């Protein structure tokens, strides 16, 4: 009995052991399946996430390329500027500010190449956006043009063919008069061919009857007046012209430097002639200033050119600022009707061909057309 019981117990234990082993296998299998499913699900999620990220990157790249293409097309149609866009860059992380005064990107001035570094903030694909300063954008061109316009307004330079660029000074319109004993405003106004009220307004004088000795007054430069010349008979006039022409022949084919500056200028020749007549040269920053910077009341008569005007031998001719790089030109008339139609005259010129400053152009004869803005100065004296 005992043996049988033990065998039966042994058989039962063995069967129970098999059942437990089967349960354990099933449990392990279920656990393995669960882990496998979990891992598979995780990998699927990761793959799905990666796919979404790539889709987003692709969308950004596509949008960026479309944006770049549209901007390039717009630039071709308007300013023909070129912008190099290498790669797909997040436009929201790129700060490019352009205005009429400056063009700065991330603290760098636009006159250098602007390069946005390869960082996560600036690039999603590890590429760079490069803007070359040799290919300016529309805003930069506008800023440059405005700056040039501003500089041109501030700068007033006239090209001088002889000495390069000089700042040109206009002839003064007023001069200073010092009040002397016995002066009155009416006498001063009469002397300078103006009115009492004009002097009052220019100098802020409240009482025209009250001025002081030594007081400085601004008065006009002597205007172009035409005093009555002395009548000369035809015989005397012919003799005077002959004597003038004979003197001018002595100036021809020689270089003249009256003031010792800038070589043989046109002004020098005229000053040599005027000094021969009156013992002094003429004032003026440039040749075109001669009629306005000198008092010719007792020395000459001023003429403006008209269709019927005929210059005489010995007259000074003054060209406007359209000649001589803004300084004008001056010469001495030899023949006032060179072509017989009052269209041309012949004169003795120096530096007409810009060779005087090198002392390479002596005084010589030149035929000119009458210009409507010419002024002629006829001295009362004859050489």
Swiss-Prot record:
Kind of enzyme, top EC level? hydrolase
Instruction: Spell out the GO cellular component terms annotated for this protein, sorted alphabetically and separated by semicolons.
Output: extracellular region
Where in or outside the cell it occurs: the entry states: Secreted
EC numbers on record? 3.-.-.-
Q: Do the record's keywords include Cell wall biogenesis/degradation?
A: yes
* InterPro entries, A to Z: CHAP_dom, LysM_dom, LysM_dom_sf, Papain-like_cys_pep_sf, YSIRK_signal_dom
Gene Ontology MF terms in the entry: hydrolase activity; lytic endotransglycosylase activity
Respond yes or no to whether keyword Signal is given for this record. yes
Tell me which Gene Ontology terms the entry assigns under biological process: cell wall organization
Q: Which ranges carry the Peptidase C51 domain?
A: 241-378
Which residues are the signal sequence here? 1-49
Q: Which UniProt keywords apply?
A: Cell wall biogenesis/degradation, Hydrolase, Secreted, Signal
Which part of the chain is the LysM domain? Answer: 175-219
What function does the entry list? Probably involved in peptidoglycan hydrolysis.
Q: What is this protein called?
A: Probable cell wall hydrolase LytN
